[in-house]
Amino acid sequence: MVAHRARRRKRASATQLYQTCKQSGTCPEDVINKIEHKTWADKILQWGSLFTFFGGLGIGTGSGTGGRTGYIPLGTRPSTVVDVTPARPPIVVESVGPTDPSIVTLVEESSVIESGASFPNFTGTAGFEVTSSSTTTPAVLDITPTSTSVHVSSTTYTNPTFVDPPVIEVPQTGEVSGNILISTPTSGVHSYEEIPMQTFAVQGTGNEPISSTPIPGLRRIAAPRLYKKAFQQVKVTDPAFLHKPETLINVDNPIFQNADTTLTFSPSGVAPDPDFLDIVALHRPAFTTRRGGVRFSRLGTKATMRTRSGKQIGARVHYYYDVSPITQTEEIEMQPLLSTDNTFDGLYDIYANIDDEAPVSSRFSIATPSRLPTNTVPLSFSGSTSNVTIPFGTSWDVPIYSGPDVVLPTGPPTWPYAPQSPFDTTHDVVIQGSTFALWPVYFLKRRRRKRIPYFLADGGVAA
């Protein structure tokens, strides 16, 4: 027979022991220190709190309030305070007419006087009348006034929603940004007409920039990348691909479509051209130059597979048609203008007279074109010999004089000192002008302690 063990009784806690043994004075020291917070840990916290302050966060106080903000339950958000903007009365904007002044004064006019609320003015009564009498006559006081007096009390309240009509206050407006809008409520009939603003007539080509700083230069448009590995390359030889590509695809219900835009088709089973089988879209065409030719290209999308969800899957095909090749520029070989068979014997002076040499003195003699003889000079070549006639009278004849070839013009001795005309143009150097202006600064210019006079002529020198 198995004996049942007695249940283990729970030991009393330190709080229960302290409540029973404190009065009798039999409590252990560790129980008293734990309950009365006199352990070493409690003493360290008490001593450290004398030098630290956490600003009312509730740390170490044991209050359990969680500081000023309190505790926030887990899984919730703190409450937010929504700022409600007070409603403001709408601002009445009055239109400005052509008769209104263009200058707006920001100082209040002195003629505008605030009169306040109107109230009636009452004049005071004559008061009481005192009747004096003799000693025998008793004093009679007339307490009834001659006219009925009325006591009127006036109280003024400020109501922001009501403005007295005789008082018009011009609002003061202060603006720093440069845009001033002054609105003043007015009453009465306006004497002007509201005319809508219109755009001024401007002249231009229509290509003017719309921004203040246009982008310099032109942006290059990216060419279509048609030769990637993701595209299947198919060459088309049928010319109908240029203007009527729909004839290469079997369409159930063909309709008119522009060939320069993207063409869409319904998938069909059989196509006239096997390269266009299962084509559902042909994108807009593009002309490119590649490998020395003009190429017409279109991108096509096929619908080879169809999933249960209705999505179509297919390859992308690049159809191209070579329109015409670009011919290379022909290189024309330059031909020599003269034959290279003839060779010269050497340097030959065509102006020399080989028949007889003239003396040196006769070369510098004065002669006219009529006096010059016309000689025939033979040219010697290895292949053949021919005579060439060269006239010697086509050049200018310049006479030669002894001394410097400078001729000064002569003029009358009286004013004005003007040179005579016509001038003698037979000389090499002719000085035009008869007056001279000498600059005083250059009379005596010091240079290396030498006095050298400089004289400049105010005239023109013509050669």
Swiss-Prot record:
Which species does this protein come from? Human papillomavirus type 53
**Any S-S bridges, and between which cysteines?**
C21-C27
- Molecular function terms from GO: DNA binding; structural molecule activity
The main place the protein resides is: virion
Q: What stretch of residues is annotated with the motif Nuclear localization signal? A: 1-12, 444-452
- Assembly and interactions? Interacts with major capsid protein L1. Interacts with E2; this interaction inhibits E2 transcriptional activity but not the DNA replication function E2. Interacts with host GADD45GIP1. Interacts with host HSPA8; this interaction is required for L2 nuclear translocation. Interacts with host importins KPNB2 and KPNB3. Forms a complex with importin alpha2-beta1 heterodimers via interaction with the importin alpha2 adapter. Interacts with host DYNLT1; this interaction is essential for virus intracellular transport during entry.
Q: Report what the Swiss-Prot or TrEMBL entry states about this protein's PTMs.
A: Highly phosphorylated.
Kindly provide the name given to this protein in its UniProt entry. Minor capsid protein L2
Q: Which UniProt keywords apply?
A: Capsid protein, Cytoplasmic inwards viral transport, Disulfide bond, DNA-binding, Host endosome, Host Golgi apparatus, Host nucleus, Host-virus interaction, Late protein, Microtubular inwards viral transport, Phosphoprotein, Viral penetration into host nucleus, Virion, Virus entry into host cell
Q: Which family does it belong to?
A: Belongs to the papillomaviridae L2 protein family.
Where found?
Virion; Host nucleus; Host early endosome; Host Golgi apparatus
* Function summary: Minor protein of the capsid that localizes along the inner surface of the virion, within the central cavities beneath the L1 pentamers. Plays a role in capsid stabilization through interaction with the major capsid protein L1. Once the virion enters the host cell, L2 escorts the genomic DNA into the nucleus by promoting escape from the endosomal compartments and traffic through the host Golgi network.
Gene Ontology, cellular component aspect: host cell; host cell endosome; host cell Golgi apparatus; host cell nucleus; viral capsid
Q: Which HAMAP family match?
A: PPV_L2
The Gene Ontology biological process terms listed for this entry are: microtubule-dependent intracellular transport of viral material towards nucleus; symbiont entry into host cell; viral penetration into host nucleus
